[in-house]
Amino acid sequence: AGNDAGVAALPANGRIAMSTDSFVVTPQFFPGGNIGRLAVCGTVNDVATSGANVRYLSCGFILEEGYPMDKLRQIVQTMAETAHEAGVSIITGDTKVVERGGADGVYINTAGVGEVPAGVTLSGANCRPGDAILVSGTLGDHGIAIMSQREGLAFSSDIESDAAPLNHLIADVLAAAPDTRCFRDPTRGGLASTLNEFAQ
């Protein structure tokens, strides 16, 4: 505690994968999660799609003056639980407060680092015509869960965000199918944008 940097072990001979993302979502709490779960899952998944064993995260908060402490505690607790679920450590962080009206409650940035095993070279550039595309779950749950809260929409069934760390799933797929060409965690633009990227 009290240090300016987190120190972590990395492979002596090998490659690392690193990704960073900033999370701005309204509302910050929604069915199935909150902005804290998104912040951990989003970066864990981005690093994991390289085939890396995700090890460490950093997190930075930008808080609007007057943001309720009980909500902040809930977000931080969710981040800790999600990191534990993913098997990663949050080793450093920072908090800044901006004037009232200078932010929409809370923004979170996370960065992640992982070790890429030897021989793993996953990339959308590897895709070829005729490749099979596998989808790990239903489409649109997260977006609809947030939209329903934001717009006050009611549905006949409960719709929850499916945000989850996918690093263990990716590792299992690679173990079973080591010739897998690439992985993606579709976010903005969804599956259609991802497939368009592959086609290009």
Predicted segments — roles?
Residues 1-200:
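Helix-biased detector of long, well-ordered alpha-helical tracts
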